[in-house]
């Protein structure tokens, strides 16, 4: 976040790889947020990324450093917009499934063109036969997206249930799961691609009337379920937070298995709304990781057992930006940052 009255926020550091096959042992990473230009609500400015002094696109960051992040905004994952859950699943799929990002880009382009054509048909400025040109790439890419999403969810199932059982052992008998809800369900023996093609044909008239594509992975959803019940409708805030943290830990396990090394775990405001027992279980899980960063505005809000094993840094306002003070409490395994 850019400080009030400033034009730039910048963070830089060295990313070291423990992978012996890595082409570089360490990389210099520099990320800046610049006020003005293409502003985004999330960051307050446009991002500028440099790796070893060379400007890079944000998409290239994954090759340098993988990270799993939990922040206050993630609390919307359970009961918020389906778009948030789709994005979370898409980002994970793109990280572990070759070709997924390309299929997603192809689908997005075909969807935009098809929607434009549907509006033109509604206004009688185009012919319906023209839809076939965009139906093919939409169906091919859309079918691949659904198949890959289902594959990722299948890989997530075991680590998700295990992580939830570790954080909330009192609910060990109620398995946490993710259920994919599609508007183009496949019939017996039907592929996701064929199911999407069939549904597009069934909704053709309605789509022309609405001027938009009404079926496809861009309208699918992922539901959090505990013992088969939708968490969005019955769970407390603490239960929802526990489920989201379990998902983040499951992502960590999945990425670790895929890459051969664990990504960084970044946690912001992680302990609020958790009862003491669940806090303790989460601390034990965090403490077992090679490295994790935990941020808080008040050190007293953190679990004492976490502080005991952490290297603690403090960020204070300064005339020229921010001052980093520490480490004030070195430990054998760094796990917290203030």
Model region roles, listed by residue range:
Residues 4, 107-110, 149:
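Intracellular alpha-helical coupling/juxtamembrane segments of multi-pass membrane proteins
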Residues 92-135, 140, 155, 159:
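Extended, Lys/Glu-rich alpha-helical coiled-coil stalks
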Residues 13, 291-297:
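Structural recognition of the conserved hydrophobic beta-strand(s) that form the central parallel beta-sheet
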Residues 2-84, 88-100, 154-162, 192-205:
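Nucleotide-state sensing region of NTPase/ATPase domains
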Residues 7, 18-19, 23, 125-264, ...:
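Conserved NTPase motor "head" modules and their coupling/switch loops across ABC/AAA+ ATPases, GTPases
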Residues 268-270:
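Walker B catalytic acidic pair
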Residues 68, 263-266, 294:
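Hydrophobic positions in the central parallel beta-sheet of the AAA+
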């Amino acid at each position: 976040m850019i400080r009030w009255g400033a034009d730039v926020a910048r963070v830089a550091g060295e990313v070291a790889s423990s992978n012996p096959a890595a082409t570089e042992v360490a990389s210099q990473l520099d990320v800046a947020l610049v006020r003005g230009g293409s502003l985004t609500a999330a960051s307050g400015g446009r991002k500028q990324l440099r790796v070893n002094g060379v400007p890079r696109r944000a998409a290239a960051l994954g090759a340098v450093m993988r990270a799993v992040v939990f922040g206050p905004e993630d609390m919307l994952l359970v009961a918020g917009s389906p778009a948030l859950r789709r994005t979370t699943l898409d980002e994970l799929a793109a990280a572990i499934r070759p070709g997924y990002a390309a299929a997603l880009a192809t689908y997005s382009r075909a969807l935009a063109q098809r929607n434009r054509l549907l509006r033109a048909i509604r206004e009688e400025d185009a012919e319906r036969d023209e839809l076939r040109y965009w139906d093919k790439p939409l169906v091919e890419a859309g079918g691949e997206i659904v198949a890959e999403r289902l594959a990722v969810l299948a890989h997530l199932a075991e680590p998700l249930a295990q992580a939830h059982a570790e954080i909330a052992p009192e609910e060990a008998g109620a398995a946490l799961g993710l259920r994919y809800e599609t508007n183009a369900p496949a019939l017996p023996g039907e592929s996701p691609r064929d199911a999407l093609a069939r549904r597009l044909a069934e909704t053709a008239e309605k789509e022309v009337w609405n001027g938009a594509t009404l079926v496809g992975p861009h309208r699918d959803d992922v539901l959090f379920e505990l013992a088969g019940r939708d968490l969005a409708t019955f769970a407390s805030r603490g239960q929802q937070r526990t489920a989201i943290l379990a998902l983040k830990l499951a992502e960590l396990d999945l990425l670790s298995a895929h890459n051969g090394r664990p990504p960084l775990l970044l946690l912001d405001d992680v302990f609020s709304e958790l009862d003491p027992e669940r806090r303790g279980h989460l601390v034990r899980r965090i403490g077992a990781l090679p490295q994790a960063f935990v941020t808080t505005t008040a050190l007293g809000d953190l679990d004492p057992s976490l502080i005991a094993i952490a290297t603690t840094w403090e960020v204070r306002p300064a005339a020229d930006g921010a001052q980093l003070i520490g480490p004030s409490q070195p430990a054998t395994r760094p796990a917290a940052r203030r």
